Each structure stands twice: as C-alpha cells, then as structure tokens.
Swiss-Prot record:
Protein name: Calcium-gated potassium channel MthK
Pfam families documented for this protein: Ion_trans_2 (PF07885), TrkA_C (PF02080), TrkA_N (PF02254)
Task performed by this protein: Calcium-gated potassium channel.
Transmembrane regions listed in the UniProt entry: 21-41, 70-95
Species for this entry: Methanothermobacter thermautotrophicus (strain ATCC 29096 / DSM 1053 / JCM 10044 / NBRC 100330 / Delta H) (Methanobacterium thermoautotrophicum)
Record note on quaternary structure: Homotetramer.
C-alpha cells in the first residue's frame, strides 16, 4: 500500500500536466457529481442514477425521467449547466490539441512514429530529384534550414527539424525503423559524422551517401555507407565521353529520366521461383517479357551481361531495362 501511494505521489504531478488527463478528470468529476446527486436526492439506485446522469449531460432527453422533488429540479439544472460547459471545454481542448499537433508536424517538431519509411539527411538539388523518384513513398527529410522546410512541404514529403549529425535528431527521425537512409549533406566530413551516428543507432539499416570528392568515397564506405554515389564523378565522366558522339550520356539520361518510356529496374528472385537453377539461356527473359537484362547482382558482386550458362539463384537481383508493362511481366514471370 505504501509503495502504491509513493508511485502515485511521484507520477501524479506529471500526469496532471497533460491536458487530456485534466479534461478526463473534469468529465469524471461531473459524472460522479450527477450520479451521487440523483442517488441521494431522488433516492434512485446507482445504476439508474448513472444512466440519468449520462442522459442529462448529453441533453438527449428521452422523457423517461423527470425530477420528483424541487431539490432534484435545481440539481438537474446545475448538472445540465456543468455538463454542457464540460463538453464545450473538452471539444475546445481537443480541437486545440489537433491544431497544435498539425502545426508542430508542419514545423517538423514531432518524432517520427512510422516504420519502413525513407529518411533523407540534408538537402540539395539531388534531394529534390530523390523526392520526385520516391513520390508515393513515406519520406522524411531531416534538416535545420527554414527554406528547406518550405521546399520539402511543397514537394509533398515530410519535414523533421534537426541536425543530421546529432544522434538525438537521427532518433527523432526514427532511422532505426527506416527502410533506408539517404545522406546528402554539404561536406563529406558532415556526411561521415552522420553515417557514424546512424550506425550507432542501427547497424543494419541501409545507408546511401553522396560523396562530394572522389577521394573520400572509400572513407564513407568505411564509416558504414552501403552505397556511395559521387554525382560529380559520374557527370564528369559522362561529359568527357560525350566529346565524340554522346550516345552513352544520352542512354543514361533517357533511362533515368522521369518521363522515359523505359525504366531501369531491380527485380529480386524469391525463394521457390521458377528461375532457380535455370540458366540465362533457358530463362529466355527478353523473349518472354521484353525486358533487356543488363546484369545480375549476387551479394556484393554485380555481374554485367551475365554469360548464357549463368544459373539464377534465389536472392539474385536482376537488373534490367523495360517498359512498365514489360517490367510487370518480368515480376510475374519470376514469381510464378
């Protein structure tokens, strides 16, 4: 008993600070007031008194009860006033809570409770392209800048206010429950700090990082990034290879373009697939589905243009190019 009293004494002040708790206690007090009043003034049972209290507070007025004493009439009037007043206060507080919560969400001040979402740490023009590609997915951008917040909300994504290099803010974005984390910060040193913070929280979440300088790619990998992309290296090489004809750059841009009729796609081979143990030649994927096979990923290895005698295994990732309907046929063909 002493332990229970001590627990109540310790936690009660904190619980009472919650607006919802105070409203609940106010409603409960009115119900107790009405039930006790009808019981002692009108002489009704506790069950009937509780029922009359709810009917009176709700102003339903079924017509199955009216006070039989003058004191009961006065009491009913006070209960109606208290009931309507309490209901009005409860609705006002509820609306205030919902509005404040929505405002806090827009400001990025609410912790992310989602799972299997994508977290983007930082902001750049690359981020904007990411958001276009991830349209329809649950995406949260973690950044501090007010201008970034406006851009994120305009793009239809969610904003989380915080410093991507701070572990507490990474936890706020719930990187532990994320499907993947994209790190797109201004400098490689910030990117490394961010990756280390993410790995401190979750050792298995997939991290894709952007490298500002080519010589830092290996350091980002050592910090814990699963995939490191250097847009400057890619664009530089494509520009240099476009000097003579430019078809290589044209191919990459067309395949990756948002409005392209053909898309590059990764399709995993599941357990029990009809392609398990089947060679590239016998699978005849292009003739069956229309998808052009560029390569096959197995573990950390990417086999570009796999030989005809290459046998597929469960867990292999087929990298191909095709139209949306061809890609759908490939998925159905693999899972059949």
């Amino acid at each position: 008993m002493v332990l229970v009293i001590e627990i109540i004494r310790k936690h009660l002040p904190r619980v009472l600070k919650v607006p919802a708790t105070r409203i609940l206690l106010l409603v409960l007090a009115v119900i107790i007031y009405g039930t006790a009043g009808f019981h002692f003034i009108e002489g009704e049972s506790w069950t009937v008194s509780l029922y009359w209290t709810f009917v009176t507070i709700a102003t339903v007025g079924y017509g199955d009860y009216s006070p039989s004493t003058p004191l009961g009439m006065y009491f009913t009037v006070t209960l109606i006033v208290l009931g309507i007043g309490t209901f009005a206060v409860a609705v006002e507080r509820l609306l205030e809570f919902l509005i404040n919560r929505e405002q806090m969400k827009l400001m990025g001040l609410i912790d992310v409770a989602k799972s299997r979402h994508v977290v983007i740490c930082g902001w750049s023009e690359s981020t904007l392209e990411c958001l276009r590609e991830l349209r329809g997915s649950e995406v949260f951008v973690l950044a501090e800048d007010e201008n970034v917040r406006k851009k994120v909300l305009r793009s239809g994504a969610n904003f989380v206010h915080g410093d991507p290099t701070r572990v507490s803010d990474l936890e706020k974005a719930n990187v532990r429950g994320a499907r993947a984390v994209i790190v797109d910060l201004e400098s490689d040193s910030e990117t490394i700090h961010c990756i280390l913070g993410i790995r401190k929280i979750d050792e298995s979440v997939r991290i894709i990082a952007e490298a500002e300088r080519y010589e830092n790619i290996e350091q980002l990998r050592m910090a814990g990034a699963d995939q490191v992309i250097s847009p400057f290296v890619i664009s530089g090489r494509l520009m240099s290879r476009s000097i003579d004809d430019g078809y290589e750059a044209m191919f990459v841009q067309d395949v990756l373009a948002e409005e392209s009729t053909r898309r590059m796609v990764e399709v995993p081979i599941p357990e029990g697939s009809k392609l398990e143990g089947v060679s590239v030649l016998d699978a005849d994927i292009h003739d069956v589905t229309g998808v052009i096979i560029i390569g096959v990923g197995r573990g950390d290895e990417l086999i570009i243009d796999p030989p005809r005698d290459y046998s597929f295994r469960a867990g292999d990732i087929i990298l191909g190019i095709g139209k949306p309907e061809e890609i759908e046929r490939l998925k159905n063909y693999i899972s059949a």
